[in-house]
Amino acid sequence: RDPTGCEVDQVIMVKRHGERYPSPSAGK
């Protein structure tokens, strides 16, 4: 398996989580 694909998958998951659960430091 390509390590790059794993990294991309993690980034996508993080982005999704950020959208669903925005960090308190986001501003709102």
Curated annotation (Swiss-Prot):
What does this protein's UniProt record list under function? Catalyzes the hydrolysis of inorganic orthophosphate from phytate.
Q: Which SUPFAM superfamilies match?
A: Phosphoglycerate mutase-like (SSF53254)
Any GO molecular function: 3-phytase activity
Region Disordered, as annotated, extends over 1-28
Q: Which organism is it from?
A: Aspergillus ficuum
Active-site residues are: 17
**Enzyme Commission number(s):** 3.1.3.8
The UniProt family comment states: Belongs to the histidine acid phosphatase family.
The UniProt entry's coiled-coil ranges are: none
Q: Which UniProt keywords apply?
A: Hydrolase
Put simply, this protein is called 3-phytase B
Q: Which reaction does it catalyse?
A: 1D-myo-inositol hexakisphosphate + H2O = 1D-myo-inositol 1,2,4,5,6-pentakisphosphate + phosphate
The enzyme class is hydrolase
Q: Source gene?
A: phyB
Superkingdom of this entry's organism?
Eukaryota
